[in-house]
Amino acid sequence: MIPRDSYEIIDTLIKQGRSFAIWRIPGEDRLHFRMQSAGSPCLLYDIKDLNERSGFVIAPFQVTAERPIVLIQPDCFEIPSESDWDFSREKNEFPSNEIEIPSESEEKERYAYHFSLFTSPLLKGSQDKLVLSRSKTIRKDPSFSPGKAFFAAEERYIRSDVYLCHTPETGTWMGGTPEILLSGEKGDWQTVALAGTQSLRDGKLPKSWDHKNWREQQLVASYIRRQLSTLGITPEEKGPYSARAGEVSHLKSDFFFSLPNPEKLGDVLQLLHPTPAVCGLPKEEAYHFII
């Protein structure tokens, strides 16, 4: 059991440059922790290289020589206490370099420019879907605690996978998502098609969805069926149904299937990533347009 007042230990592990991850799976109350105390994380340059490997994976949207997949190979499975770890040894792993913080108007102008680039192929019909993400740079408050932020997030977003991870190669990442790329064990596996967004109605899930949201979710569902079929897999399906994520809801379908060779998970991940929910369709054209 990981006590939820361990945020100071998490903050210290980050300052010391440790390679670790802490996360909570949707619907669970138990926190998971993995740390590699000996050696450096493994760097991989192709998703298929995850075949026959295990550990905590930190992967970029685009895998390159400069941005490889980082695999934490844990040898520690519990958060260390102050008594069994040298918490007096702290260092500033990343020098506090000054970075330029763009103004709100500059950020808005930059987003509007990229928005126009993305809408053009959609209006022409050369792309069915493109996902434009937004980044925002803010100045970190000196009192900000990554550990405290993680514990607050995992308590609030009980239906999401909430995580915090750190390595010297990647820096610190924290996030939460209701979308499962792939989950399971041994021969039984699951993925989801999650798309469409609607606000809750008086705290309740909506009972109806418009054509735009239905079409958006079906694009993702059809993609998953096609990708799995290339491996000869015909999954069992549940949905689509309304699923809550924070203060909004999405349309969700579950896909259940068996894998004759679970050690080849890298092959399955390469087929599924990136899904239309985070990239677009057609997959290859959308992927290369974004990068």
Language model features: what each stretch is:
Residues 79-109, 115-116, 139, 192-290:
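Contiguous alpha-helical scaffold segments within structured protein domains
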Residues 57, 125, 182, 222, ...:
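A residue-level signal for conserved active-site and pocket-lining positions in enzyme catalytic cores
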Residues 27, 61-62, 75-76, 186, ...:
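A broadly conserved detector of short glycine/acidic/proline-rich loop/turn motifs that flank catalytic sites
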Residues 8-10, 115:
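Glycine-rich, flexible loop motifs
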